[in-house]
Amino acid sequence: MAMKKLLIASLLFSSATVYGAEGFVVKDIHFEGLQRVAVGAALLSMPVRTGDAVNDEDISNTIRALFATGNFEDVRVLRDGDTLLVQVKERPTIASITFSGNKSVKDDMLKQNLEASGVRVGESLDRTTIADIEKGLEDFYYSVGKYSASVKAVVTPLPRNRVDLKLVFQEGVSAEIQQINIVGNHAFTTDELISHFQLRDEVPWWNVVGDRKYQKQKLAGDLETLRSYYLDRGYARFNIDSTQVSLTPDKKGIYVTVNITEGDQYKLSGVEVSGNLAGHSAEIEQLTKIEPGELYNGTKVTKMEDDIKKLLGRYGYAYPRVQSMPEINDADKTVKLRVNVDAGNRFYVRKIRFEGNDTSKDAVLRREMRQMEGAWLGSDLVDQGKERLNRLGFFETVDTDTQRVPGSPDQVDVVYKVKERNTGSFNFGIGYGTESGVSFQAGVQQDNWLGTGYAVGINGTKNDYQTYAELSVTNPYFTVDGVSLGGRLFYNDFQADDADLSDYTNKSYGTDVTLGFPINEYNSLRAGLGYVHNSLSNMQPQVAMWRYLYSMGEHPSTSDQDNSFKTDDFTFNYGWTYNKLDRGYFPTDGSRVNLTGKVTIPGSDNEYYKVTLDTATYVPIDDDHKWVVLGRTRWGYGDGLGGKEMPFYENFYAGGSSTVRGFQSNTIGPKAVYFPHQASNYDPDYDYECATQDGAKDLCKSDDAVGGNAMAVASLEFITPTPFISDKYANSVRTSFFWDMGTVWDTNWDSSQYSGYPDYSDPSNIRMSAGIALQWMSPLGPLVFSYAQPFKKYDGDKAEQFQFNIGKTW
């Protein structure tokens, strides 16, 4: 049989033997070389069918179509009479993908990039794509200064036309900057200019995280920094003429040279605003005022443009265009700024939508909105909604997106995109100290119950000295106006002796109800009523305790430690909160002030009042809010009314993870001074340091904390980026260095009567500590670790350097 052979093998272009103008009619099509690809699939990809008359062009199109499927690396077309014989060589299938030597780039990231290029297990191997990936990865290494890096793809054949693909990396070392030169600078020294760069050719010995590694992206950023530095100081003609980056022969060193032209300094002669101002010319004019003789400043010009856009955005102009054109007069060295404004269309809000709130109900988010559907768009109202969502503490991130409605010239949708965090926490605390040993506490809190926004807490403690249970529920939107309603039930069996406090037992239970009233965006008031029953027993005679009992008309014996006393109190509870933090957890900017207090009302056995003031202020010191200074204070004071004293069990305490770290919880402040026991049940274990008078025991000092009716605590904290934590988890982990100080005192202590004992009425006995803290928003809830070293303490204070707590952040 005579066979006329046509051979065509090309990846992109094909050629065929000419069959003549009339061609031939295909009566059958046969394939050779198919393994993975089905015959039917191959036929469907061909433009030629049985019965078609074909010519050279049809054959070429067939070749191209088969190559376009990506399944073949070679295609041959043969004619055997009226039969078309297609011989193919399939591309091998990737059986596995592995990596070797990659340290700077993680395997997961490499796999994602490969899959984005169509390279994955089970797919055909495209050698052209692999070559492009090799080059792309090498370019990446070059951009971060690793010029000796190489990436090679190793393809290992396997049976059944399969291959193993292995990318072998030789990353090498990062080239270090040997010198940065700036040529053409006269007004500023090179050192002064380089001090604002991210890249460095010298690193001080104390900068343990600094390096001299070169990165292309950082150089681009530094050039913009250099440009802004000059433009902000009046150099309107400043120009970067060229930049050279030179490698040493061993590719380990880099020299960077930046050639600039400074030009002269220019002053602003005026600002002229024109265009479509949408009737807000007077307000825009206020934003463009300049001081006579003011130097041209590029940053101020940009800020002015942004301020005009924000102003128009508040009135519904969602997409204004503002362009500033400096008109430079070289003769008198002045710049006249011409600002062209096009407000564009004014937009209504058609819908407000929420994305990412898988747990939180839409209504919980919608009630925080200040922008209304159907109203003019207000960018400030949209931003207020974002702030309020952040302050809820339910979300890791909140972003907004204003989307135009297709086909409408004046409508937009506002989309809030949230990333929810775990708002429930299992509170479990462990502390260890040189004197205290190990201590525990536990509880459960859910701030967004079933996505309704309700805060529900069930807390319980069971240890050697306390059995405590509490149920609390708060509805933040009891009314549509934002009036909140909260309630609490609790039971507490507390044996102070076993807690290293003054010796007594108190079994109490009670309830309270509180209403919260929003005043404006940042202020709210609270008011409520409470009831508590206290049953005191096993009260060992102690000066401050007996002083309270005497004020209540009780005269227990100082030789009896089995005294008991019961009270029923009704209280009016009140509070005020100012909250302008940027978000509900891990804030980075703003402040919060919380004032709480209570006073007994008629029908109570006790008569007293108690006030606590907490403040926190966050001040970011960089634009990204990664470096933040935090200042916190806590003030407390209480006293009796009508000649009575405030109950000793209502005293303030300090020490522990929420006040002065490095000290055991509640141990800072006045210590118990006991009367000597004469009864038959006298326990010699309570015989501490007893003074004598006329041969008889007088009073006994101890290390048992009793608290006081006044407290002052302050903390200064420096929040820093957490080392070795990627940006993905930066919002979930916080590291800080702190300095805590605080004191507790008793204003009713009579130092003249007890001259031989410490003056517990002196507020100047301030304790201090310093240390480091780590907070993590874990799946279990917030975890807080701290290590603090007390450096100012007094006799009787108990240190607890390491403290660990789940369930509390600040």
UniProtKB/Swiss-Prot annotation:
Residues 1-20 form the signal peptide. InterPro entries: Bac_surfAg_D15 (IPR000184), BamA/TamA_POTRA (IPR010827), D15-like (IPR039910), OM_assembly_BamA (IPR023707), POTRA (IPR034746). Its main location: membrane. The keyword Repeat applies. One of its GO terms (cellular component) is Bam protein complex. One of its GO terms (biological process) is Gram-negative-bacterium-type cell outer membrane assembly. Residues 24-91, 92-172, 175-263, 266-344, 347-421 form the POTRA domain. It is found in: Cell outer membrane. PROSITE patterns: POTRA. Part of the Bam complex, which is composed of the outer membrane protein BamA, and four lipoproteins BamB, BamC, BamD and BamE. This is Outer membrane protein assembly factor BamA. The gene is bamA.
